Amino acid sequence: MASSDHQGHPPPRRNLVPQAAASLSPALAIEGVSHSFGARKALDAVSFSVAAGSFTALLGPNGAGKTTLFSLVTRLYENRSGTIHVLGHDVRVEPAAALAKLGVVFQARTLDLELSVMQNLVYHATLHGMGFASARRRALEVLAQASLAERARDKVRNLSGGQMRRVEIARALMHRPRLLLLDEPTVGLDIASRAALVEQVRRLVAEEGIGVLWATHIIEEIAPGDRVIVLHRGRVRAQGDYEDLLRRTATEDISAAFLSLVDDGAGEAA
């Protein structure tokens, strides 16, 4: 199985995914999106894009607005300003078409602990209009990719935290989305489980050409070659390739770059 080179650069096998390479639309395009909860502005004119077949890190401390942004993209909240497009589909104008291209792993775990792994996946697939037989076949495929095929009949409550997260990713892939959103997916995991989860998602980008937006506050999950968006207090403070942020901030590592960008004197979005 192909994997990344640990520098954020996908292996040559990525060229075998024509739909990603040929896509004329970014996997996700957000333009001028703001959102408020009463008098508190959670997002302020946020704009960025995620290219098809790329790993993009949305980096920000807790409370930066990452979860609010995901709620807007997934239509849990309605965006009243700006536009959000998933593979060219406006989520307000064409919500069904947009959501059909989208897979999501939320920060809060949403699996039914009393159902088996297979039951969780099949139930999700039926919500997307898949028949039972095709849903079971697809479930076995995505579980094999996640090295969890042997746990298909186990109740979810008997899995480890890392295994539950891998099942949630498998569930998000059931309907073959072209964009995958992950909101702080490694929270609560040990170091080994966290590293395995990051590697699994990077393989999806490299092998299947899926566009990924990975929201995190953990610096170590970002690698050279990644595209990075720094979100702080609801505003995009910077965006660009990993190396671009180092040059812009005149720092030697992404942790120092991040700290300089979220300082009270940090500049506006690039």
Predicted regions and their residues:
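Helical segment within the ABC ATPase nucleotide-binding domain
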Residues: 195-207
